[in-house]
Amino acid sequence: HHDGYAGEVDGLPADALDNSFGCGNPLAFAGVSPGDVVLDLGCGAGVDLLVAARKVGAAGRVIGVDMTAEMVERARANVARAGFANVEVRQGIIEELPVESGSVDWVISNCLINLSPEKDRVFAEIARVLKPGGRMRVSDIVVDDLPEALRADMVLYASCVAGAVSEAEYLDGLRRAGLVDVAVVERYPYGTEVLPGIGDIADRV
């Protein structure tokens, strides 16, 4: 499931790769440049942190946020194993980010925002932490007309689906938060007829 990374994960710690549960590569289309500050929401074991660290170089900075102490520890261990000095992992929730306002160039997230029941708060937080002209690039799951019985199914919720909203709702939420130039860059069909869409969603502030 690292097909979207095209060599970008070569040489990275196996623990980061084996515990990557994303649904895409949020950096695949990103114009991340050396010196940029990148924030990864729900960094997990850290695979996207490490890919981002390579892109921003020594002059840049990468911040990962995850809500579980276990994943924060694992991500820190993988960062240390990979030898990056420009990556910091913080424990926190995406609805209330432990990140200064106007401090990051890029917000990335891989299959996480769909799990939040308070997406408007997440989108508002993204808008808050981005610098003027900063950008967001997300791989996430969107659905069309998810039946209530499925939405209530906690097993599906845990596997990234029942918390998802429609593409239109997702994009509207980003716009309400004050983000502009909101667009879907690529769509991948996924699962059955009731679970049709993963979109890489890109926009900038």
Give the location of each predicted region.
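Conserved alpha-helix/loop element of class I SAM-dependent methyltransferases that forms part
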Residues: 2-37, 51, 55
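Class I SAM-dependent methyltransferase SAM/SAH-binding core
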Residues: 33-96, 121
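Short conserved loop adjoining the S-adenosyl-L-methionine
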Residues: 96-101, 117
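A short SAM/SAH-binding and catalytic strip from SAM-dependent methyltransferases
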Residues: 105-118
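A short glycine-rich, Lys/Arg-flanked "PGG" loop and its adjoining helix->strand segment in the class I
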Residues: 120-135
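Short, glycine-/aromatic-enriched active-site segment of Class I SAM-dependent methyltransferases
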Residues: 142-161
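Short alpha-helix
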Residues: 162-178
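Conserved S-adenosyl-L-methionine
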Residues: 171, 179-191
